[in-house]
Amino acid sequence: MKRLFLLALLAGCSVADTPYPIAWDPIPAPAAADCRQFEGTYADRGELFGQTTRPSLTRELFGADSPWEKASSVRLEFAAEDSVEVTVAGEGLKPETRRFSIKAGEARCDRGRLTLVAKRWVASDIMSGRESVKIELNQSDPFLVTHVYEAITGVMFLVVPLSGESARWYRFTRLKP
């Protein structure tokens, strides 16, 4: 009983929500009701307001186990009516494509706003568990502005249950349409 109480006491939960940066231009209303406006190529490294580190769009979309460190660009394309294709490219990196299915709920276009959803297992020296990521994409030329919601539930050191959520705003420069 003491061990169960200790485990419950050590279990953790964290929530972090970063508001939209006031210094950035406001996100305009979508110009069209469809999401073809997002088709194009974007820089993989972006901006997180107030931070010197440059976030990776590839890492947010594909996870920490993806080749995000070598990525230089991300291409969004509506190759079919029922999916969004995301292709990652970089020097010395074989292009990697992932298809987000609209029918499976991995992608959604709602009045000109595109949302991509990914669920993946994560494992590291410290933690293992299930991660859910929802990325809302907004066009604010010359940037792709993303609102990334992450939720993870798992165990730390294979013993301590942990759950956390975060929401952050990033922006990535459009390279070419």
Predicted ranges, named:
Residues 70-139, 171-176:
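Contiguous, well-ordered beta-strand patches that form the walls/edges
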Residues 13-73, 117, 129-130, 140-177:
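Amphipathic/hydrophobic helical signal segments and adjacent flexible N-terminal regions
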Residues 1-13:
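Sec-dependent bacterial lipoprotein signal peptides
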Residues 2, 28-29, 95-97:
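Short, intrinsically disordered, charge-biased short linear motifs at domain edges
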